[in-house]
Amino acid sequence: MGIHGLAKLIADQAPSAIKEQDIKNYFGRKIAIDASMCMYQFLVAVRQDGNVLQNENGETTSHLMGMFYRTIRMLEHGIKPVYVFDGKPPQLKSGELEKRGERRAEAEKLLAQAQEAGEQENIDKFSKRLVKVTQQHNDECKKLLTLMGVPYIEAPCEAEASCAALVKAGKVFATATEDMDGLTFGTGVLLRHLTASEAKKLPIQEFQFTRLLQDINLTHEQFIDLCILLGCDYCGTIKGIGPKRAIDLIRQHGSIEEILENIDSSKHPAPEDWLYKEARGLFLQPDVVDCSTVDLKWSEPDEDALIQFMCAEKQFSEDRIKNGCKKILKSRQGSTQGRLDTFFTITGSLSSKRKEPETKGSNKKKQKTGATPGKFKKGK
């Protein structure tokens, strides 16, 4: 689910923290990808006849097709993807998972009614609501990635939290997910629409976390409290508090505790036994992968094993799989060229108070080449 209304709130309150990017701008970047979100995207994708992709045995294979081709697309653009799979959900998420189960049961009833009435639009709509990523989907995608030579990580808990930890540790450049709670976990850069279908022609949205906090004038802890007020997976929220009011209250009072002290509880009651402190703790100190043990390596695809798995077992076209292998190998040859900015380290900006020896035209040169940390161009 992520954080309710956070993307729109950022667009309204801190638009310069968002940039629209083309995939080619991430050449040479290592990016941690929320695997569950990807698989869900692939599973809800349908063919023109309205059916999910299946093999002759009736097994769903759309997750494998999506994982294969979207991964190749990233590799062709010089991106080094690492997929991060969800581990065991935290206990606090049990309430949200229970609600999802109830929504699935309701969707099953509505689907049956739509099928009886022959309403194709509603059949498609409610069928998508019943899509669930299973352990088999996870295992098959892990096998596929291994055969493609692409690394993956099994997170101990939430994938987005481990993605954020990898970014903080400098192992990868960004987190790629559609869920905005990657920012709540503190990822320095969050990318949306990286794994979206090319047919949708969606520009990649790049969120800069440091710039976001600067623009909304909140600390990370205050931002977490804001996200809890907006609505997250771990607990309820105060009734009748919308996004604009939530950020105003955090700016005014600084924390949920102070808000509860000053708000009219008869108009805006908090949930009974509200576990906001526990939710805050999960965002601040999540259970994540030990980044010091992570050694990311991309290798050549195992073409024979890929053909056995994808063609003999899953009945994909052998020509297409072979062609995909050629693209992976070609991308590996191109990826030996690094990003120019990886050869330099910015150690800090020059102090304006410090006098430097001046030569003719030096002021102009400084203006052209000087870099100030934390400044980004507003996306078009």
UniProtKB/Swiss-Prot annotation:
One of its GO terms (biological process) is base-excision repair. Phosphorylated. Phosphorylation upon DNA damage induces relocalization to the nuclear plasma. Its EC number is 3.1.-.-. Binds 2 magnesium ions per subunit. They probably participate in the reaction catalyzed by the enzyme. May bind an additional third magnesium ion after substrate binding. Residues 348-380 are annotated as: Disordered. Pfam families: XPG_I (PF00867), XPG_N (PF00752). It is found in: Nucleus, Nucleolus; Nucleus, Nucleoplasm; Mitochondrion. Coiled coil: none annotated. Residues 1-104 are annotated as: N-domain. Interacts with PCNA. Three molecules of fen1 bind to one PCNA trimer with each molecule binding to one PCNA monomer. PCNA stimulates the nuclease activity without altering cleavage specificity. Belongs to the XPG/RAD2 endonuclease family. FEN1 subfamily. This is Flap endonuclease 1. The lineage of its organism: Eukaryota, Metazoa, Chordata, Craniata, Vertebrata. The gene is fen1.
